[in-house]
Amino acid sequence: MQLLAFGVNHKTASVAIREQITFAPERLPSALTELVNRSGAKEAAILSTCNRTELYCGCAPGQQEAVIEWLRQYHGMEPKILETCLYTHPDHSAVRHLLRVASGLDSMVLGEPQILGQIKAAYSYGLEAGTIGRVLGRLFQHTFYVAKQVRTDTAIGTSPISVAFAAVSLAKQIFGDLESTTAFLIGAGETIELAARHLFTNGVGHIIVANRNLDKAYQLANQFNGYAIPLAEMPKHLSEADIVISSTGSQLPILGKGTVERALRIRKHRPIFMVDIAVPRDIEPEVGELQDIYLYNVDDLQEVVQENLRSRQAAALQAEEIIDTQVEYFMDWVRTQDAVPVICAVRQEADQLRKEALEKARRRLAQGHDPNEVLTMLAHNLTNKLMHVPTRQLRSLGATGDELALQAALKIFDVDHFKA
């Protein structure tokens, strides 16, 4: 079975393309089932975040095109559009790619920790769908171990830097002191929680949290002395916001140009800084055309993010060394799996010969034969039966002059010398 990783990320595809290829969490189990049934993949997992959509598959050699074609058809994408931004990683490269992603080495913000939780979620969805088998199961467990090792043994995780942090950093550049500002947070997931934490740490004046699930909004708002509102009441409160950060799982925009225009009129056109971290986007792109709106999406944050890379470069080099070692360790395990069916077949054959020889010995004992004689004959017969086929095959190899096969036989039987 061949390992295959393929997909798009923030480096290869714009947010406009990435939002076409995302998978809503509630659709992942059915999508995984469909992927396996239609493409012929034996194992599969899907990682879908704001910055990347990646598929990890175990499939037969030659099935690569089928699984990629499934992804294209599932989202109804034009072949040329997908081809321009799609990357593929087979086998050894697939393992390396997943380990790098889990360790934060392939993230927009180098070393960010949120991706590991997202990979664990992808693994859980695969388990739920029944598409995680022996190989992918082992790969994901190994990935979790390596990501933890990278965090423990390097400084890759020092200084809390993330897309949320980049958004707050940009807000500070625009407003300077945040004490007199009100931040309006849309959503209540991990990214919004991080943004709230960074805003609170940087002294933001007020925090409002809007979410479909009001209980989650209350839980988040209470942590930072803010207040919560249902998402449906967002238009009523938007005029209070100096800063808007949005990250929901909505498949359609939830904040349109008309709503923002009304909020600006109420604010007497005092500017609003908006960051749309969601993919698909929560805020209609046309909102950015308004004169008093400063709208940024995840791609726009790249410049801010780049400034934070320098402190983690040395740690990233250390992490790459750890990953190099662990890729080889995992591939050694994969290679041993090719021998498992052979080992099972050989042991099964040997066990059958053992049973037959043992049954024959028991009959002779029941007939009153001398036990020592029976044991001697049992050992003799079992040795002959076990060695009959290997001996015949070795003679045949010798007759054909197959030196490589004969050398392999020496290794298999652990014979480091023989007499001519």
Curated annotation (Swiss-Prot):
Report the EC number(s), separated by commas if there are several: 1.2.1.70
NADP among keywords? yes
- Has keyword Oxidoreductase? yes
A biological process (GO) annotation for this entry?
protoporphyrinogen IX biosynthetic process from glutamate
- Binding locations of NADP(+): G187, A188, G189, E190, T191, I192
Q: Which residues form the active site?
A: C50
As its record notes, the protein acts as a catalyst of: (S)-4-amino-5-oxopentanoate + tRNA(Glu) + NADP(+) = L-glutamyl-tRNA(Glu) + NADPH + H(+)
Q: Which Pfam families match?
A: GlutR_dimer (PF00745), GlutR_N (PF05201), Shikimate_DH (PF01488)
Q: Which UniProt keywords apply?
A: NADP, Oxidoreductase, Porphyrin biosynthesis
Q: Which InterPro entries match?
A: 4pyrrol_synth_GluRdtase, 4pyrrol_synth_GluRdtase_dimer, 4pyrrol_synth_GluRdtase_N, GluRdtase_CS, GluRdtase_dimer_dom_sf, GluRdtase_N_sf, NAD(P)-bd_dom_sf, Shikm_DH/Glu-tRNA_Rdtase
* Annotated positions binding substrate: T49, C50, N51, R52, S107, E112, P113, Q114, Q118
Q: Which is an annotated GO molecular function term of this record?
A: NADP binding
* Annotated family: Belongs to the glutamyl-tRNA reductase family.
Please share what else the UniProt entry notes about this protein: During catalysis, the active site Cys acts as a nucleophile attacking the alpha-carbonyl group of tRNA-bound glutamate with the formation of a thioester intermediate between enzyme and glutamate, and the concomitant release of tRNA(Glu). The thioester intermediate is finally reduced by direct hydride transfer from NADPH, to form the product GSA.
Q: How does it assemble?
A: Homodimer.
What is said about the domains? Possesses an unusual extended V-shaped dimeric structure with each monomer consisting of three distinct domains arranged along a curved 'spinal' alpha-helix. The N-terminal catalytic domain specifically recognizes the glutamate moiety of the substrate. The second domain is the NADPH-binding domain, and the third C-terminal domain is responsible for dimerization.
Name listed for the protein in its UniProt record: Glutamyl-tRNA reductase
Give the gene that encodes this protein: hemA
